[in-house]
Amino acid sequence: MKKLFSAKLFSALVLSFSLFSTAHAASPKDELNKRLSMNGGFSADFSQQVISPEGETVMEGEGTVEIARPSLFRWSTTSPDENLLVSDGKTLWYYSPFIEQVSIYWQEQATEQTPFVLLTRNRASDWDNYKISQKGDQFTLIPTAVDSTQGQFQINIDAKGVVKGFNVVEQDGQKGLFTFNNVKLGKPKADRFTFTIPNGVEVDDQRN
């Protein structure tokens, strides 16, 4: 009788602990927020692949990325074409030397077109616009807005807050896969997040 009672008590305790743990486990949104908050910034090299809906590699590229949270970033593509994306937290510049043009946006405008911005500011209200799931170190974000033109955005970030890369899955099935290498933690210098418009280039100011 004592053995039966002990077995029942043990089972009840295990069940209670299991329910307690589940109730207090961090949600994917909270876990993502926590991991992104661990480091104030980083710099890295990146490699990029664009995969067609049919599974073919249609483009490969590489470059460098620098981030200082909140909201500062410098994204420099060196191949296949040279271009530069810089944000000072308020204004975003996109410079294409090949066509000699600079496009200027408010950073708030760019989130829909460039979900990468989500990585840089880690703003709690942003995550409310997504259904977030977690599988290991990969977090998948799906927009909740019915009229959103975004597909899925996947962030690969480990338990120490080191971002390993991210993926953009378009609604038509095309994928952009970005992998970070040679990651160096720490905020880059502030002057890395300023941009001076070169002389003679065309300026397309979309802030108005």
Swiss-Prot record:
Q: Do you know which SUPFAM superfamilies this protein is assigned to?
A: Prokaryotic lipoproteins and lipoprotein localization factors
> Where does the record locate the signal sequence feature?
1-25
Q: In which compartments does the protein localize?
A: Periplasm
Q: Which InterPro entries match?
A: LolA/LolB/LppX, OM_lipoprot_carrier_LolA-like, OM_lipoprot_carrier_LolA_Pbac
Record flagged with keyword Chaperone: yes
> Which keywords has UniProt assigned to this entry?
Chaperone, Periplasm, Protein transport, Signal, Transport
Query: Could you provide one GO biological process annotation from this protein's UniProt record?
Result: lipoprotein transport
**What's any one GO cellular component for it?**
outer membrane-bounded periplasmic space
Name the domain of life this protein comes from.
Bacteria
Keyword Ribonucleoprotein belongs to the record: no
Q: Which family does it belong to?
A: Belongs to the LolA family.
HAMAP family the UniProt entry points to: LolA
The record's section on PANTHER family has: OUTER-MEMBRANE LIPOPROTEIN CARRIER PROTEIN (PTHR35869:SF1)
Role of this protein: Participates in the translocation of lipoproteins from the inner membrane to the outer membrane. Only forms a complex with a lipoprotein if the residue after the N-terminal Cys is not an aspartate (The Asp acts as a targeting signal to indicate that the lipoprotein should stay in the inner membrane).
Q: How does it assemble?
A: Monomer.
What is the protein name for this chain? Outer-membrane lipoprotein carrier protein
Native organism is: Vibrio campbellii (strain ATCC BAA-1116)
